[in-house]
Curated annotation (Swiss-Prot):
GO terms for cellular component: cytosolic large ribosomal subunit. This is Large ribosomal subunit protein bL27. InterPro entries: Ribosomal_bL27 (IPR001684). It comes from the Bacteria. One of its GO terms (biological process) is translation. Keywords: Ribonucleoprotein, Ribosomal protein. Residues 1-22 are annotated as: Disordered. It comes from Anaeromyxobacter sp. (strain Fw109-5). Gene3D superfamilies: 2.40.50.100. Pfam families: Ribosomal_L27. Belongs to the bacterial ribosomal protein bL27 family. GO terms for molecular function: structural constituent of ribosome.
């Protein structure tokens, strides 16, 4: 076994792609049922009215309407959908 690294050897050179998390739809934007609103790990943003949550904490719209972000009970962030009339 060599005690010196060979020429051109590198221990770097690997990286993983990003996981595309974050807010996908911002406040007062229009959405249709099924649109993904937030991709997250854990409940950084909690679901409000007309918003569902997947098993990976993804928040999605249950109805067509307008997105509304608000705060409740201290610093808890909530996203809701105001349905179109």
């Amino acid at each position: 076994m060599a005690h010196k690294k060979g020429q051109g050897s590198s221990r770097n050179g690997r990286d993983s792609p990003g996981q595309h998390r974050g807010i996908k739809v911002y406040g007062s934007e229009k959405v249709v049922a099924g649109n993904i609103l937030v991709r997250q790990v854990g409940t950084l943003v909690h679901p409000g009215a007309n918003v569902g949550m997947g098993k990976d904490f993804t928040l999605f719209a249950l109805v067509d309407g307008t997105v509304k972000y608000s705060r409740a009970r201290g610093d808890r962030r909530i996203v809701s959908i105001l349905p179109e009339a």
